[in-house]
């Protein structure tokens, strides 16, 4: 079977969409399928082309058996709504034209970004092939939630296009049960929607001893390290975490480590300086292979989203990689994500944006050795049940049935 997959994020980018697509496609190739990925020159999240690549009109490479086609797009940093929209639209257009010349039995387009789904839908029409829409975020609803854009004619147009995509797709694959419920409420038949959650590559993310060399380099030996590793975006409300850190300075030898970048990174660096806090280290992102070293030195893996009803429907992918390395989780997200962490006893949850509850749960997690070991065991069970290989196989079965 020839699978054509459209995504605007792909390795060597290291964000969750790139990782999910790559690990799924790699498994499908191992199972004998022909997979072509149309993507762009790696540039996320800083909008700078990675070393060794150029933003050319068309270039090909083979990655673990996956045929990867990289096409030109207007590249900008992950900040500023208008520029990012132009970025997304340019990829939608060039990926469509590139896709016209690829053989395919089925087309998959992943959203966000939503304009990638529009390209998939249009290709399906012109090539007379079925298409699957993968929904990893409820876009454009999430734009309004984070305050990037208020209700206006553009949003209403995008919502209209969103419904057209849902109707035209032969199958919709979502990443949470809550998304399935939300789409059903929009009038999408339940039998059209399948759930394939995120997971962990258990060959890559396995328990390891703390990296002593890294601890020495960061001058964090003998510290209790609470770490946030991932995108520093509008949805993640990391200013709240910095304010919590400021209120806990000098307490219990706690130190907060931030690793990553995103639209809010510069604001967060300025806030750190304005608050004058010394118990926070903020670093730029590293490769997927190197990120294991940073996870290894954590005592607690921090996961946070702003307080919103929409975010009760999401499951941050950070849960799974941290669980794979058996790092107990402290999470400020309600809804389905909280149900997973608490049901597996993989960590503790605090009320989103509550400083008092954040401090209370953090103290509880790091002051009770029995609880801490229980959380490590819960992480182990969680990682076992969300094995990316198994999930990739389940998604491939859906693709075969859809074809």
Residue ranges: model-predicted function:
Residues 184, 190-192, 200-216, 237:
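Acidic anion/phosphate-binding donor-loop and adjacent secondary structure
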Residues 236, 287-294, 299-323, 329-340:
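Nucleotide-sugar-dependent
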Residues 357, 364, 371-385:
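A short, well-ordered alpha-helix in the C-terminal region of glycosyltransferases
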Residues 253, 259-260, 265-293:
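Nucleotide-activated donor-binding/catalytic signature segment of Leloir-type glycosyltransferases, i.e.
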Residues 178, 199:
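Carbohydrate-associated surface elements
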Residues 1-64:
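N-terminal subdomain of nucleotide-sugar transferases
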Residues 51-59, 206-219:
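A short helix/loop element that forms part of the nucleotide-sugar donor recognition site in Leloir-type
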């Amino acid at each position: 079977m020839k699978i054509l997959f459209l995504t605007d994020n792909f390795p060597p980018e290291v964000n969750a969409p790139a990782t999910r697509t790559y690990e799924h496609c790699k498994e499908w190739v191992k199972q004998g399928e022909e997979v072509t990925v149309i993507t762009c020159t790696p540039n996320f999240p800083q909008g700078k082309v990675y070393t060794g690549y150029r933003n050319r009109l068309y270039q090909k490479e083979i990655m673990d058996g996956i045929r990867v086609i990289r096409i030109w797009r207007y590249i900008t940093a992950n900040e500023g709504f208008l520029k990012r929209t132009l970025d997304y639209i340019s990829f939608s257009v060039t990926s469509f034209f590139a896709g016209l010349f690829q053989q395919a039995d089925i087309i998959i387009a992943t959203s966000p970004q939503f304009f990638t789904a529009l390209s998939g839908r249009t290709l399906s029409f012109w090539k007379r092939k079925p298409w699957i829409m993968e929904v990893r975020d409820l876009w454009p609803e999430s734009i309004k939630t984070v305050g990037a854009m208020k209700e206006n004619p553009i949003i209403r147009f995008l919502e209209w296009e969103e419904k057209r995509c849902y109707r035209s797709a032969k199958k919709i694959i979502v990443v949470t049960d809550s998304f399935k419920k939300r789409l059903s409420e929009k009038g999408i038949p339940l039998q059209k929607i399948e759930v394939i959650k995120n997971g962990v590559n258990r060959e890559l993310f396995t328990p390891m001893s703390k990296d002593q060399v890294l601890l020495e380099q960061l001058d964090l030996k003998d510290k209790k390290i609470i770490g946030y590793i991932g995108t520093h975006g509008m949805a993640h409300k990391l200013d709240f975490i910095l304010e919590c850190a400021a209120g806990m300075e000098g307490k219990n030898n706690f130190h907060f480590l931030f690793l990553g970048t995103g639209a809010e990174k510069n604001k967060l660096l300025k806030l750190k300086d304005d608050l004058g806090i010394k118990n926070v280290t903020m670093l730029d992102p590293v490769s997927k292979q190197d990120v294991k070293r940073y996870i290894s030195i954590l005592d607690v893996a921090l996961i946070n989203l702003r307080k919103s009803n929409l975010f009760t429907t999401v499951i941050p992918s950070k849960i799974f990689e941290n669980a794979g390395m058996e790092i107990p989780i402290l999470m400020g997200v309600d809804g389905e994500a909280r149900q997973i962490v608490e049901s597996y006893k993989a960590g503790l949850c605090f009320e989103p944006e509550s400083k008092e509850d954040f401090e209370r749960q953090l103290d509880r997690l790091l002051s009770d050795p029995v609880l801490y070991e229980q959380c490590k065991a819960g992480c182990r069970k969680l990682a076992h049940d969300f094995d990316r290989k198994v999930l990739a196989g389940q998604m491939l079965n859906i693709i075969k049935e859809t074809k």
